[in-house]
Amino acid sequence: MYAYNTSKTFVLALLLLLPCSLLTITSAAQDEPEYKMELGGGVGLTNYLGDFNGNLTRDIQPMAGIVAKYKVNPRTAWSAVLNYGTLKGNSRNEKTYYPDYAGAPISFSTKLTDFSIRFEYNFWPFGTGNEYYGAKAITPFIALGAGLAFAKGDETATAFQMPIGFGVKYKLQKRLNLALEWMMHFSGSDRLDGVSDPYGIKSSDLFKNTDCYQGLQLTLTFEFMEKCKTCHNDRE
């Protein structure tokens, strides 16, 4: 009888402690700090796409950059990105015939400085310690933005550019994030290669017959500026 009562008391104690334990675990997850900002840098590859190159894998050059992000909520963020790299091209590699350059093929190398403001959308809520609203340590994302491109070679060109692309983010640690992204930058200029309108056909459209460039970049960012723990609206 004594053993039965002891067992009954033990079971009742477990039943009472279990909800308390679950509440403690949930509270700990909810109290996990979240951060508003990210700051970091990245390295990658870029190449020019225009009149003298239509190949995504030709004349690939290195690039590097810095990035700052403001996280609106686990699904969305705004980022400011500054990149520096090189664009190269050569008309000898193109099948298109350019009468003005048939006897003197064009070869160029320009230093590219690129700045843009982007909006990022994560397909899954991104983070750790917040599983109660579905946060994931890895997520694919898409990005769209606007900015400026500065190309300096034999000539200097400044152009409006619109980056659009996608990537994947992975949380290495609670405050350390790794991202791999591919972006296509559509510029409003045909002079990033130093030559304007080699076809001799003028265009009035913003992105028609203009130069573009792409970038594949790996970035590492650190989170800082802790969010107010009583602000829950941005988690929806």
Give, region by region, the residue ranges found by the protein language model.
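Outer-membrane beta-barrel strand-turn architecture
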Residues: 33, 70-74, 123-125, 170-174, ...
